[in-house]
């Protein structure tokens, strides 16, 4: 099946999207994060229990307040199928790009840039925008650097249930003067 990226629509997330978001999280984590270099296996990734009702419910609650308060979620759709999403948060003193995930078969088509543009528009450029990315995810780091993010440092954070640590790079988007 040939995918036409011009048919991809970026939209605000709505209630009912939460199971699709969890599916995309699980699929992209399994495709991206296992690494012999840092000792993370597929089993380690699966230990996050992506499919739990607790995770689905947490996304449902986030979608309910999306755009109204300090959180925003947008999705990329190929017809009726959600193929990617982005979540951003307004914090005191700075803003944050919390997540940006696209199904592997849809990566490299400009969808990430469209989602990021939408999130940055919502956040505004009055405060720095930070993100954290797995330090071994060179494709994502390159994508963010092309967008204008710069590395600020390396953070070690326990992300997995089994106690394994996945090193992350923190990045910040330079503010552009008005």
Where are these regions (language model features)?
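Flexible, glycine- and charge-enriched loops at secondary-structure boundaries
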Residues: 52, 109, 164
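Conserved S-adenosyl-L-methionine
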Residues: 153-154
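Acetyl-CoA-dependent GNAT
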Residues: 3, 8, 12-18, 22-105, ...
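C-terminal "cap" of GNAT-fold acetyltransferases
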Residues: 130-141, 145-147, 157-178
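Conserved glycine-rich acetyl-CoA-binding loop
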Residues: 81, 99-117, 134-142, 146-147
């Amino acid at each position: 099946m040939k995918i036409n990226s011009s048919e991809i629509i970026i939209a605000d997330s709505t209630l009912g999207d939460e199971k699709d978001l969890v599916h995309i999280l699980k699929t992209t984590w399994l495709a991206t994060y296992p690494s012999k270099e840092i000792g993370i296996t597929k089993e380690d990734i699966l230990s996050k229990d992506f499919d739990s009702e607790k995770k689905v419910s947490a996304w449902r609650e986030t979608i309910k307040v999306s755009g109204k308060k300090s959180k925003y979620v947008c999705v990329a759709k190929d017809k009726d199928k959600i193929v990617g999403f982005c979540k951003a948060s307004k914090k005191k003193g700075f803003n944050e790009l919390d997540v940006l995930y696209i199904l592997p078969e849809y990566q490299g088509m400009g969808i990430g840039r469209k989602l990021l543009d939408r999130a940055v528009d919502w956040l505004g450029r009055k405060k720095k925008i930070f993100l954290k990315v797995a330090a071994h995810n060179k494709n994502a780091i390159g994508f963010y650097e092309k967008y204008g993010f710069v590395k600020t440092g390396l953070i070690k954070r326990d992300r997995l249930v089994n106690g394994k640590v996945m090193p992350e790079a923190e990045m910040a988007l330079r503010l552009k003067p008005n």
